[in-house]
Design a protein with these regions (language model features):
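Extended alpha-helical scaffold/tether regions of large eukaryotic proteins
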Residues: 1-156
Length: 156
């Protein structure tokens, strides 16, 4: 849980180390530049998945297309919009995953070594299954390395 929140000493050190690593910035730039730019260019859609909030950002003219609030037609159109947004989010996440896979060759060796040492150490701990150890390593990479670059790409 502490790794996931990024509040334990190890995850803080990992994040600070990866932020200062030039090869990490190269990897993040190579991996995330194109999908983030595409997302920014195609930023017309508000990818909201909460039915109560789907129409909040729409203009009154756009809201009228959903019908009268509370009607069955309105609910169906909102649900259709939610499903369309979910499909767009799935496609977007798959695009990011594709770029991550495509650029694994330039993943920084020092970060690879740290994660492998973490994996080896945690694999020896009684009571931890291999799946849990893999999840912890993945959480560390996502929480402290990849997601911050997606949320704040200018820094990288």
């Amino acid at each position: 849980r502490l790794l996931r929140r990024g509040t334990c000493a190890f995850s803080i050190l990992f994040k600070l180390f990866s932020e200062g690593l030039y090869s990490a910035k190269l990897f993040l730039t190579a991996t995330l530049h194109e999908p983030i730019m595409q997302l920014l260019v195609e930023d017309e859609d508000h990818l909201e998945t909460d039915p109560a909030k789907v129409t909040e950002r729409l203009t009154p003219a756009q809201q009228e297309r959903f019908g009268e609030k509370g009607s069955e037609d309105y609910k169906q159109r909102v649900q259709a919009a939610v499903e369309a947004n979910e499909a767009k989010l799935v496609a977007l996440v798959n695009k990011f995953i594709g770029y991550l896979k495509q650029n694994t060759y330039c993943f920084p060796h020092s970060l690879r070594w740290i994660v492998s040492q973490m994996y080896k150490t945690l694999s020896c701990v009684e009571g931890l299954e291999v799946g849990e150890v893999r999840t912890m390593c993945t959480d560390l990479l996502l929480t402290c390395f990849i997601c911050p670059a997606i949320v704040n790409p200018e820094q990288y």
